[in-house]
Amino acid sequence: MKTREEMVNELFKIKIPAGLINYIAKKERSVLGAGTMNSLSKMNDQAIRSLYSAIIDDKEERDDYLLIRTTMWLVSEFQSAKISIDHPVPNIGDFRIVCLNEDDDIIVVVDCKMNQYEWNQIDEFISKLRILKEREMKLTNAFVVSRNADASEIVNKLKDVQGMGSDGTFVTKEKQGLGGLVGGKPNKINFSMLIEKS
């Protein structure tokens, strides 16, 4: 097993978002420093082990394994975005992970969990997306991420969701023109359900 110092050095070489470091430090009741290296150096052993086992070793040892892996994937996909975990949105609720642009506009929302999703959880997420898109016009992507789940039943139900296209485009609301006629550009989000396999 690697020493704490070796783990910190390996983690420092990876671009770990500040939002993830803050989340793990808070969860493990660890102190933080200013900047990534300072924060990693000051984090307690459990926090370092959590990050290391999920990011470097790819070991599913903890409940937040998928959250850590998903966050790291988002960093590679949306490189200039800031990450926020358990992000509160007034009058809508919390989103598990969001990516924010430089103006703090929400551009990506993600819900992830280790176990199988129930349809009511997906339906609730979709309802929150409809409301959020009305406020956050820069929102372009939404992901539901699960681990080793059978998603066939949920995928079949997604086909029946109003505005959900077979190509993954989710139209949250048609824009209304003059006299209530449909016109203008609709509110669209790229919606994907991802399954991480072990």
Task: Please state what every model-predicted region is.
Residues 1-198:
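Intrinsically disordered, low-complexity Ser/Thr/Pro/Gly-rich regulatory segments
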